[in-house]
């Protein structure tokens, strides 16, 4: 049951763009995890730039740098 939780600065994506993004992400997950499409879920959470450090970096990125399989090219 892979679940992907995308956090990003706000983007003006329409429903078609969101659907395409989810399909692309799901395709990669299905290929690498040998999952079924019905098992994959994708969330898109838009976080204001001024809230990024408190809501994302301090809770999900910074404390878990050793666990990340793709590390960011920035620090806070």
Curated annotation (Swiss-Prot):
Enzyme class name: isomerase
Subcellular location: Cytoplasm
Disulfide bonds: none
Enzyme Commission number(s) of this protein: 5.3.2.-
Molecular function via GO: intramolecular oxidoreductase activity, interconverting keto- and enol-groups
Pfam families the UniProt entry points to: Tautomerase
SUPFAM superfamilies: Tautomerase/MIF (SSF55331)
Active-site residues per Swiss-Prot or TrEMBL entry: 2
Main location: cytoplasm
Keywords linked to the UniProt accession: Cytoplasm, Isomerase
InterPro entries xrefs: 4-OT-like_dom, Tautomerase/MIF_sf, Tautomerase_PptA
Superkingdom, taxonomy of origin: Bacteria
One GO cellular component term: cytoplasm
Subunit structure, as described in the record: Homodimer.
Family: Belongs to the 4-oxalocrotonate tautomerase family. PptA subfamily.
Protein name as annotated: Tautomerase PptA
Native species: Enterobacter sp. (strain 638)
């Amino acid at each position: 049951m892979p679940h992907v939780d995308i956090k990003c600065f706000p983007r003006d994506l329409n429903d078609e763009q969101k659907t395409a993004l989810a399909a692309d992400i799901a395709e990669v997950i299905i290929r690498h995890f040998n999952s079924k499409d019905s098992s994959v879920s994708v969330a898109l959470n838009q976080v204001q730039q001024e809230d990024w450090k408190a809501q994302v970096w301090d809770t999900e990125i910074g404390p878990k740098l050793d666990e990340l399989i793709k590390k960011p090219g920035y620090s806070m």
